[in-house]
């Protein structure tokens, strides 16, 4: 897959090869220039990012911070100067199946007026709708106001809890929103904005998660936290946070959950992102629309086995192909599915995973 954008300088590639098997990050933020507005590019280094966006811009600084963590050019960027730029960009890039999308200029509680529905909507509701429409395996990582904006830790925590509480109240009042959230809440991660010297903690979290090592927990980062937050401070909330270790002088990511409605294994953000990685790697496009029979079933099984064997030991401990079947939805229509049993690292039991082919 190629991401093509208009070339205006000669120091960076006009066409970047996009490897969908990697955990790629898309940073959406504001530059100090109008260069490459709403265009998806990979700066391929800090010099090009500074040239494109301005060295002091929030987009360039976030890119540099992420690159220092991932140490590889898996970070794509978009210059979004207005709120409408975010909507236009998200609508046009989700089909690329980025692992993590980070809309830095948007907060979890931000809303916009949708002229199609004639009402105000949360951006994250619209993002979940698009993920459903495109059937992609992307995780949106959101944050909120920075901890330095608050007089005390209690006020900072109260603010974040209020945001989540109001969103959940809004969701449960609308049947359509509730149905969407019930199905796709795991596609959203909310992290507290509590790192010193970092404007957007969601960009840092995306970098931590993008390092492909499912055998261990995400690596700590070389940042201090503004407040010392503990597990008891975020009890029963769908909110990840960074915790500073005074011995190592680094910060870990704790309470790493997504915003899934149900309290089950799939609310674990590491499990969810591991499953999405499996789905991205399992390429069944050539079987879609095909007449289901014993031969097609065998081909799907062989394709899945080859892919899963290559992933075993890096993404998960073990797996089983439980079933491959066909679900009839109409007289001449239906879909093929594959059911897997996956044993993640850190677990003693298999978890059930079902993918529509």
Model-found features: residue ranges?
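A glycine- and small-residue-enriched flexible loop/hinge signal that marks low-structured segments
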Residues: 1-52, 57, 63-300, 307, ...
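C-terminal edge-of-domain segments
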Residues: 325-357
């Amino acid at each position: 897959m190629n991401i093509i954008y208009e070339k205006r300088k000669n120091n960076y590639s006009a066409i970047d090869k996009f490897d969908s098997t990697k955990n790629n990050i898309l940073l959406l933020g504001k530059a100090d220039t109008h260069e490459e507005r709403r265009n998806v590019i990979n700066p391929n280094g800090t010099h090009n990012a500074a040239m494109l966006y301005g060295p002091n811009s929030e987009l360039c600084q976030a890119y540099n911070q992420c690159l220092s963590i991932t140490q590889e050019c898996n970070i794509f960027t978009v210059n979004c100067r207005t709120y409408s730029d975010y909507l236009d960009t998200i609508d046009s890039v989700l089909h690329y199946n980025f692992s993590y999308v980070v809309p830095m200029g948007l907060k979890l509680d931000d809303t916009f007026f949708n002229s199609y529905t004639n009402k105000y909507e949360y951006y994250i509701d619209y993002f979940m709708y698009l993920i459903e429409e495109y059937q992609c395996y992307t995780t949106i990582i959101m944050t909120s106001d920075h901890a330095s904006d608050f007089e005390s830790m209690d006020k900072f925590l109260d603010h974040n809890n209020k945001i989540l509480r109001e969103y959940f109240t809004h969701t449960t009042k609308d049947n359509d929103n509730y149905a969407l959230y019930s199905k796709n809440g795991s596609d959203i991660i909310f992290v507290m904005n509590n790192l010193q010297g970092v404007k957007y903690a969601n960009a840092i979290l995306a970098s931590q998660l993008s390092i492909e090592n499912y055998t261990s927990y995400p690596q700590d980062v070389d940042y201090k936290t503004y407040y010392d937050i503990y597990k008891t401070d975020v009890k029963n909330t769908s909110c990840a946070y960074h915790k500073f270790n005074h011995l190592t002088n680094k910060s870990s990511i704790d309470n790493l959950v997504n915003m899934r409605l149900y309290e089950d294994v799939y609310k674990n953000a590491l499990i969810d992102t591991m499953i999405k990685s499996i789905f991205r790697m399992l390429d069944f496009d050539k079987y879609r629309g095909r007449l289901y029979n014993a031969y097609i079933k065998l081909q799907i099984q062989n394709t899945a086995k080859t892919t899963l064997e290559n992933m075993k030991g890096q993404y998960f401990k073990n797996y089983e192909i439980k079933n491959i079947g066909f679900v009839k939805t109409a007289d001449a229509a239906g879909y093929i599915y594959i059911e897997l049993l996956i044993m993640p690292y850190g677990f003693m039991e298999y978890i059930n995973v079902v993918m529509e082919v």
